């Protein structure tokens, strides 16, 4: 088993890690000849999942990977440890960042070599990892779902985050309504009333050949704090963010150049 590469876009990788680790710190990293994937499946009670896929050519140069499993390698790692390494690697004066898979005192680690272009300093850092077999990786699958009940392109995420941050101080439950006539609303309720915000004129991307009626709409309730965590992705300046509602979950698809991130959040079931 062999993996080594030069990290050419450490700042992009850092921003991605900083955002997805808001969901959960433990992560599965899956490296293939074409892609780098981060998979987060938080504890059973939380129910959130994140699947992040980055085109290998965006992040790595001088890339080598070899394994008995179709040249794919997968392992568990701590995202905070990776964040700290990337943070130091993106500081002023750093010119080259290399990484490779190796062993330290008999245990597998992700080894980093950080070279400073100004002082000539070389820093070595290791992140302990837990290697996974191909059989274990085969059990980790992204959920397969039918077409959503309704879906819509979200408005400016930075502004939306400010709205949701104010709402989360009022209630734990966020009511989301999507109408297929370009409307979206968010609502929180209190014992004395409710607070809502409305958006109109939003687009509906098409899923497959099925065209939904403009009269169709759906409403679900989700944990507002979990939804607020997803909105931090605005820091990556995505080109498109699609919100999909299902009976038991919502999905947020985040599209960037050569990066796709999908968040799965469970719907709150009221008794």
UniProtKB/Swiss-Prot annotation:
GO terms for cellular component: checkpoint clamp complex; cytoplasm; nucleolus; site of double-strand break. It is found in: Nucleus; Cytoplasm. Disulfide bonds: none annotated. InterPro entries: Cell_cycle_HUS1, DNA_clamp_sf, Hus1/Mec3. The keyword Nucleus applies. GO terms for biological process: cell division; DNA damage checkpoint signaling; DNA replication checkpoint signaling; double-strand break repair via homologous recombination; meiotic DNA integrity checkpoint signaling; mitotic DNA replication checkpoint signaling; mitotic intra-S DNA damage checkpoint signaling; nucleotide-excision repair. Keywords: Cell cycle, Cell division, Cytoplasm, DNA damage, Mitosis, Nucleus. Pfam families: Hus1. Belongs to the HUS1 family. Essential in controlling the S-M checkpoint that couples mitosis to the completion of DNA replication. It is also required for the response to DNA damage. PANTHER family: CHECKPOINT PROTEIN (PTHR12900:SF0), MITOTIC AND DNA DAMAGE CHECKPOINT PROTEIN HUS1 (PTHR12900). This is Checkpoint protein hus1 homolog. It comes from Dictyostelium discoideum (Social amoeba). The lineage of its organism: Eukaryota, Amoebozoa, Evosea, Eumycetozoa, Dictyostelia.
